[in-house]
Design a protein with these regions (language model features):
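Polyanion-binding surface elements
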Residues: 2-28
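Helix-turn-helix/winged-helix DNA-binding modules
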Residues: 7-8, 32, 43
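Short amphipathic alpha-helix starts
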Residues: 26-27, 46, 51
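Residue-level detection of the helix-turn-helix DNA-binding "recognition helix"
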Residues: 31-32, 56
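Short Lys/Arg-enriched helix C-cap and helix-to-coil transition segments
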Residues: 38-44
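A short, Lys/Arg-enriched interface patch at domain edges and termini
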Residues: 49-63
Length: 63
């Protein structure tokens, strides 16, 4: 039997640190791109695996 470990949600600040950008950049990406962000109440939350896949896809570039 395989065990699946649930991935934790991270905050917008943690997402910015993970990607090496400012929080304002993350906010701009939320408005202008399809960054995998999930609004939970008033807060934006992210999954590291989704962010990494998004960056690898090349969609993080803003024209």
């Amino acid at each position: 039997m395989s065990q699946q470990i649930a991935e934790n949600w991270i905050s917008i600040t943690e997402a910015a640190i993970h990607l090496g950008v400012k929080v304002d950049t993350i906010r701009a990406w939320i408005k202008k791109t399809d960054i995998p962000a999930h609004k939970i109440g008033k807060l934006w939350k992210f999954k590291i695996s989704e962010l990494d896949a998004w960056v690898k896809s090349g969609k993080s570039a803003i024209d």
